[in-house]
Structures are given as C-alpha cells and as structure tokens.
Swiss-Prot record:
Similarity-based family: Belongs to the peptidase S24 family.
NCBIfam families in the record: lexA
HAMAP family: LexA
Active site feature: S129 (for autocatalytic cleavage activity), K167 (for autocatalytic cleavage activity)
Gene assigned in the entry: lexA
The protein, known as: LexA repressor
PANTHER family in alphabetical order: LEXA REPRESSOR, LEXA REPRESSOR-RELATED
C-alpha cells in the first residue's frame, strides 16, 4: 500500500479513531477542525488521495460515507450505521412551522433506532422548553413515526395552527395538554392535536 504524507496520516488516524469510538465516520468539517484545515476543499483533496491510495472508500451520494479499507480494517470496531432523514426543524420553545422535507441524511449507529428504519426520522431541536428532560437546544431527536401516544410520552405534535413542537403528551378529560419540561414555561392546552411521532432517542454532538 502506498505511503501516506504526514497530513494524510493525521486524517486517516483521526477517521479511524472516530469510527472506533462512535461507530461511524466524522464529517468533512470535523476532520478539518481536528487537523487544523479551514478549507473543506483541502480536506476533500486529502480524502481523494487516501481513496486513490486504497486506504478509504467513499460514497459521494451520502454524507460521512467514509469506509476504511486498509489491511488494518480488522482492528477497527465498525458498527453498522443507517442514514436517517433529517426533516426540517421543530421547536422546543415557541412552536414554529415544521419544514416537511428532507434536509439531509444523518448516519446513526443502528442500535440507536431499535425499530424499522423506514419509520425513523430526525428533527433538530430549537429552544429550551424540554431541558429538564435532557433535551437541549441544538440536539437531534430520533423520532419513530406514529399517530398515537400514551400519557407521559415525549412526542412530536402538530398543533391546531399546524405548528410542530416537541412536548410531553397528556390526554385530559376534554382537552390535550402538551407539557414542557421547563419549570419556567406554561403547558399548551389544545382541543385537537396530531401526533406525528414519538421521541425514542437523542443524539448530541459533543
């Protein structure tokens, strides 16, 4: 196998480390930050050289799709990943209209989904109304598509104004209560609510 330059070795070692610790490869931006390269095109150039030299394989149709293919592959604990669609944004504060289109695909370790992959999507959280449930501004919530919920479930709901929000769900006698997990905020009371899905997991980039 052809020899690597110092910079290529740094990038290759970083990719291996992230795959070992997280189970999936880093993004181009993360690689650049790790090795001190501000230009994404420069990072892409080094990745192309690594690919030409037979150290990695890439799928240009998917983000983060970097596969280690050197003779050291057996040393790397690679967890199976799935590419989950990121569907717009949903607020965890004052509701905003959800953008019902796929913005990107995000790789997740398969064990985080624990259900049929086609039923899973991700929403980016904006706001602080769920902080006491450990859901912070900027987190990605992993959501299973479903139209029913039980009391106490954390759900993605569409309100009567066709706004999307993440809240804890309660069905009361004559209404629904969408309860924030922030003691400084008031619940939302609704006559009708559409359950879009149940939050089954959380991803946070450290």
């Amino acid at each position: 196998m052809r020899e690597l330059t110092k910079r290529q070795s740094e990038i290759y070692d970083y990719i291996k480390k992230i795959v070992q610790t997280k189970g999936y490869p880093p993004s181009v931006r993360e690689i650049g930050e790790a090795v001190g390269l501000a230009s994404s095109s420069t990072v892409h150039g080094h990745l192309s050289r690594l690919e030409e030299k037979g150290y990695i394989r890439r799928d240009p149709t998917k983000p983060r799709a970097i596969e280690i293919v050197s003779e050291q592959l057996d040393e790397v604990n690679v967890e199976e990943t799935i590419h989950v669609p990121v569907i717009g944004k949903v607020t965890a504060g004052v509701p905003i209209t959800a953008v019902e289109n796929i913005e990107e695909y995000f790789p997740l370790p398969e064990h985080l989904t624990s259900t049929h992959n086609s039923d899973i999507f991700i929403l980016n959280v904006v706001g602080e109304s769920m902080i006491e449930a450990g859901i912070l501004d900027g987190d990605k919530v992993i959501v299973r598509s479903q139209t029913i919920a039980e009391n106490g479930d954390i759900i993605v709901a569409m309100t009567e104004d066709e706004e999307a929000t993440v809240k804890r769900f309660y069905k009361e006698k004559n209404r629904y209560r969408l309860q924030p997990e922030n003691s400084t905020m008031e619940p939302i009371y609704l006559d009708n609510v559409i359950v879009v899905g149940k939050v089954i997991g959380l991803y946070r980039e450290m």
